[in-house]
């Protein structure tokens, strides 16, 4: 949908300081009501409720163009906005700290890889699930342990690891096993269901083990500001899988659907 953009401001609208022209920015994809910015029911998303960035030029609200100073390329910076803000929003909602052990299914994906890096930044112990062919790429993100994508006996595969948080964008038929291995008082945070939204669940697992489930979609504006700080001081790094010229957008989308990549695919106008 072209939600992640990095570029340079070339023009501004009425009421916007002309000094912003020439400023390097990345986009905050969440469109908020300027009169009621805290109301989650009055939000849209860049590339959905507003035309996105699959273009040579794009427009956005001034508040959504976030200044950034970095030696990273535009293509590298374009990997951050959507995936990393989604991940940081999930970890923020789940109150992840250095006392947690976090399990990340789908760690080779854009959000999954961001979850690995951002949870490590918080000092948590991180265990990643990914297909064996992608283990080397995932290892570069810094998890403490990497397991197969969907071990038949997840508890045995984890050994003595005590999982306090599952940060998930996968869902699907494996979901119940993710919940089953959570420690008492554990937290499950979710912002996607790429393997399927319908799951079977025994509610007794939820209440007898005092679990907390948190959905995460609309992020607080401060999340994006925090991400920029992390990028500028080098605390997180881009996971750029491939680039395609804008005229090869169809090929880029086909590569994304094929899911043979690790990280994010970027289109360059």
Question: Where are each of the predicted segments found?
Answer:
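Mid-domain Rossmann-like dinucleotide-binding core that forms the NAD(H)/NADP(H) cofactor-binding site
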Residues: 72-151
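Rossmann-fold dehydrogenase core element
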Residues: 184-191, 200-240
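C-terminal hydrophobic helical "lid"/dimerization subdomain
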Residues: 89, 221-269
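Glycine-rich cofactor phosphate-binding loops and adjacent beta1-alpha1 units
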Residues: 127-130, 139-209
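NAD(P)H dinucleotide-binding glycine-rich loop of Rossmann-like/cofactor-binding domains
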Residues: 29-106
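Glycine-rich beta-strand-centered segment in the early N-terminal region that forms part
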Residues: 1-34, 69-71
């Amino acid at each position: 949908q072209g939600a992640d953009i990095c570029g340079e401001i070339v023009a501004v609208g009425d009421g916007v300081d002309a000094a912003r022209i020439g400023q390097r920015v990345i986009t905050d994809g969440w469109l908020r009501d300027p009169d009621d910015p805290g109301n989650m029911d009055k939000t849209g998303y860049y590339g959905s409720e507003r035309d996105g960035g699959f273009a040579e030029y794009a427009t956005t609200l001034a508040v959504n163009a976030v200044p950034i100073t970095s030696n990273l390329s535009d293509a590298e910076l374009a990997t951050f906005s959507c995936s990393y803000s989604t991940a940081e929003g999930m970890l923020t909602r789940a109150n992840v700290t250095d006392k947690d052990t976090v399990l990340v299914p789908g760690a080779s994906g854009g959000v999954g890889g961001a979850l690995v890096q951002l949870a490590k930044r918080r000092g948590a112990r991180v265990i990643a699930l990914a297909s064996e062919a992608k283990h080397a790429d995932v290892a570069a993100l810094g998890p403490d342990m990497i397991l197969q994508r969907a071990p038949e006996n997840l508890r045995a595969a984890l050994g003595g690891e005590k999982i306090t948080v599952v940060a998930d964008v996968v869902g699907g038929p494996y979901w119940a096993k993710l919940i089953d291995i959570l420690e008492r008082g554990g937290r499950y945070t979710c912002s996607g269901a790429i393997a399927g939204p319908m799951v079977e669940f025994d509610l007794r697992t939820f209440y007898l083990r005092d679990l907390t489930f948190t959905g995460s979609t609309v992020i607080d504006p401060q999340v994006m500001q925090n991400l920029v700080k992390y990028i500028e001081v080098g605390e997180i790094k881009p996971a750029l899988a491939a680039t395609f010229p804008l005229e090869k957008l169809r090929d880029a989308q086909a590569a994304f659907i094929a899911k043979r990549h690790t990280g994010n695919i970027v289109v360059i106008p």
